[in-house]
């Protein structure tokens, strides 16, 4: 994840978030303090003001990624410019087991998050802009509507005629119309932001990548072009991870973790690239043959994942060029404005 190191921050605040409340845990003058506040902006700001009055000015919140429930705390901390880290729940689960903690309550979870922050000193998350949060939310809504549309179409197979059939068909068409409207809204938001628009146009230049795939990458992978190839592959969940221990040292690596919906979005452009992109096609054939050829079960799937990784690395490389070009352009503009404003020329 794109992040900044912040080990100099002294007070870590563990925040366990639920629908209506936030349980908080932090150390103040060597004493562990536990409290609970409402999950709304006013209560969060009040808590931060009170804790700062105790001279606890260096704050670093530790919270798990809990979807929409964490949105209020996320945006409030971002607007107040207070550092925080969104931790993968898998990491905190493993940390709890390593500490021998088997009980699970909101209070204990907040204490574990605070303990995790002090011991692991995680990097601070660089918060997304409002436009990026909106894009992700819109795309996740699109995924939900596609799933619902598929379910309605499956129901239509069991109703061949009559009122039930007509209602089901109307529902499927209505959902399809909403999906089209969502696609238009996503396109407008991408085009409204210069960086996203240039990234989108650069992706369309790559053989095999279409409008839907480019939109998905921008919505679900805002880190594109800011990380190296290995990091971006792991983030997408297409990097081979070794599982070797004891006598199992000869077992092959497998993909694990990553962003599931992003992998799904990469599948179709990769299939297209395997046909139309000569570099990806040659890579697919090479990997498949190395795994035993077309007649060996699973060889094609392994080759396809390898091609997804290669395609994503290429997209990441092109996105990095776009970002570097934008930075140079901004730097040149800034230099020109400074030169014009200078009295000594």
Per-range role (PLM):
Residues 2-27, 113:
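Gly/Thr-rich phosphate-binding beta-strand-loop-beta motif of the actin/hexokinase/Hsp70
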Residues 19, 67, 91:
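Short, glycine/acidic-enriched loop or turn micro-motifs at the edges of active sites
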Residues 30-60:
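Nucleic-acid-processing active sites and adjacent nucleic-acid-binding tracks
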Residues 62-73:
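Acidic, metal-coordinating catalytic cores used for nucleic-acid/nucleotide bond scission
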Residues 211, 217-300:
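Phosphate-backbone recognition surface of nucleic-acid-processing proteins
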Residues 247, 284-345:
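Low-complexity, acidic/Ser/Thr- and charged residue-rich accessory regions of DNA metabolism proteins
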């Amino acid at each position: 994840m794109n992040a900044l190191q912040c080990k100099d921050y002294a007070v870590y605040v563990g925040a366990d978030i639920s629908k209506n409340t936030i349980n908080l845990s932090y150390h103040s003058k060597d004493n562990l303090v536990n409290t609970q506040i409402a999950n709304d902006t006013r209560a969060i700001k009040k808590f931060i003001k009170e804790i700062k009055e105790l001279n606890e000015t260096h704050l670093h919140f530790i919270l798990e990624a809990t979807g929409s429930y964490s949105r209020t705390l996320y945006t409030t901390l971002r607007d107040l410019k207070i550092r925080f880290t969104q931790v993968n729940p898998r990491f905190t689960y493993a940390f709890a087991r390593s500490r021998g903690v088997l009980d699970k309550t909101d209070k204990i979870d907040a204490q574990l998050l605070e303990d995790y922050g002090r011991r692991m000193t995680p990097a601070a998350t660089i918060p997304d802009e409002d436009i990026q949060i909106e894009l992700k939310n819109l795309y996740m809504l699109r995924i939900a509507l596609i799933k619902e549309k598929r379910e309605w179409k499956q129901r239509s197979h069991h109703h061949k005629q009559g009122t039930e059939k007509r209602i089901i068909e109307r529902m499927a068409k209505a959902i399809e119309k909403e999906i089209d409207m969502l696609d238009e809204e996503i396109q407008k938001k991408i085009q409204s932001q210069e960086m996203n628009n240039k990234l989108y146009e650069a992706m369309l230049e790559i053989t095999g990548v279409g409008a839907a795939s480019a939109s998905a990458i921008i919505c679900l992978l805002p880190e594109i072009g800011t990380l190296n190839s290995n990091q971006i592959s792991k983030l997408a969940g297409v990097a081979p991870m070794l599982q070797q221990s004891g006598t199992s040292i000869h077992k092959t690596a497998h993909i694990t973790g990553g962003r599931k919906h992003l992998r799904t979005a990469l599948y179709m452009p990769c299939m297209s690239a395997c046909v139309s992109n000569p570099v990806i096609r040659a890579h697919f054939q090479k990997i498949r043959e190395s795994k035993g050829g077309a007649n060996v079960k699973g060889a094609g799937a392994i080759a396809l994942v390898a091609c997804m990784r290669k395609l994503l690395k290429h997209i990441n490389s092109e996105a990095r060029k776009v970002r570097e070009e934008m930075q140079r352009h901004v730097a040149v503009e800034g230099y020109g404005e400074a030169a014009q404003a200078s009295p000594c020329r």
